[in-house]
Amino acid sequence: MSCDTQEATRECLGMNLDGNKEPVSLVESGVRSESEHLQVTIGATVPTGFEQTAAGEVREKLKSACRISKDRGKIYFDIAVESLAQVHCLRSVDNLFVVVQEFKDYQFKDTKEEVLRDFEELAGKLPWSDPLKVWQINTTFKKKKAKRRKANQSAGKEKADCGQGDKADEKDGKKKHASSTSDSHILDYYENPAIKEEISTLVGDVLSSCKDETGQSLREETEPQVQKFRVTCNRAGEKHCFTSNEAARDFGGAIQEYFKWKADMTNFDVEVLLNIHDNEVIVAIALTEESLHRRNITHFGPTTLRSTLAYGMLRLCEPKPTDVIVDPMCGTGAIPIEGATEWSHCYHIAGDNNPLAVNRAANNISSLLTKSQIKDGKTTWGLPIDAVQWDICNLPLRTASVDIIVTDMPFGKRMGSKKRNWNLYPACLREMSRVCRPGTGRAVLLTQDKKCFTKALSGMGHVWRKVHVVWVNIGGLHAAVYLLKRTAQAFVHPSDQDEGRDPPW
């Protein structure tokens, strides 16, 4: 085990759950065997409407059964603790949490006082042990990553001070850029095979130290090092006689009494979640401090698409190796960047008519390349992605040269106008049908202006066939993602069709 892993293990044991202050020796075979049998339920929030897509990713990458909650935008699946690294590498999830206990049919009392009293009594009856171990491992590795990042930044500064010239300054700048990224960049840290091995070892250490713990020992350990916590209640349903704040207040007070933790609404260590949807109640512990959807974007625009939503749209069209994937209205480039990260055997083109948008997309691509070089520790040959400025109604692409088109079309709210969409949408669909391969091409288009899009699509039935529609919520706006299939009919330019002659292409 490496020195930094030992340091992380000591740090973890410094706040271990059974009060054992002595170093714990690691018995490799026994501990690994135990860790493999420790199963926990992980919950994840996903873009509303893409629950099936996220569940498919879980089944594909984790080989785990996944169930979709009746509360929209959430999925649940069981994993071994040592698979935590793979969970953080999922592309379709926004936030992660470990489930403490789930009540599928919780019986609420008739009065507010009785319900809140039940919440107070519930805190001491829950199986906190395993979820807190998972939270512990997750927190320890985030701290380790922060220390490594700080060390890399310091090393870069030292090289610059030693007169390494522009190259050292550039390298230091890259490391500074990496250090400014958010908690979501823990994804890259977890993707390292060496880190995955360290996770298994650390899991063993924690399980060994917590082997014989009880609820009483949990409470005792919090006294030397008091954790700060808060309770967040997410409630949906009309038949509740209490508010979210009341539930969080009383449940949080009971947790404080049980663990002797200190309540802190802003600078907290542990966030306990109380999710209530009708009669379904789930108590959980958050594993992410902020959403993972910002993972690839550093230069934001007025309508930047969430990376998790971009992944869901790309997954809908099932990219195959060597596919040419185009986003003709790319904005900040969220869709092509997500595509280049996950489907590196395809070629991705980001285009927009706004030079500011193209510049943002180019900067985001450059940042992604820099991050890849820092993560791998070596110079890479680049990414299968490029950005270009063009007119969506007159794309500089050959006819039938594109396999997939994925784009976020103007809603007519923050960008463009609904009046202009009546001319823009038909022209876009016509030009997309020209560059898309007949018979095999597909398009995934996101829009909130459903009336205009439906009208435009009705006039394109000879070249586009609607396959599926996913209803999503974008910042409170009810939008739709349309999956279209290109028909086998060859594109005929309107001018050639009117004159009755064969098109030049």
UniProtKB/Swiss-Prot annotation:
Query: Which Gene3D superfamilies has this protein been placed in?
Result: 3.30.2130.30, Vaccinia Virus protein VP39
Which biological process terms from the Gene Ontology are attached to this UniProt entry?
tRNA methylation
**Family stated for the protein in its record:** Belongs to the methyltransferase superfamily.
What's this protein's name? tRNA (guanine(6)-N(2))-methyltransferase THUMP3
Task: Please give the InterPro entries that the UniProt record associates with this protein.
Answer: RlmKL-like_Mtase, RlmKL-like_Mtase_CS, SAM-dependent_MTases_sf, THUMP_dom
UniProtKB keywords: Cytoplasm, Methyltransferase, RNA-binding, S-adenosyl-L-methionine, Transferase, tRNA processing, tRNA-binding
Keyword check for tRNA-binding: yes
Does the keyword field hold rRNA-binding? no
**Task of the protein:** Catalytic subunit of the THUMPD3-TRM112 methyltransferase complex, that specifically mediates the S-adenosyl-L-methionine-dependent N(2)-methylation of guanosine nucleotide at position 6 (m2G6) in tRNAs. This is one of the major tRNA (guanine-N(2))-methyltransferases. Also catalyzes the S-adenosyl-L-methionine-dependent N(2)-methylation of guanosine nucleotide at position 7 of tRNA(Trp).
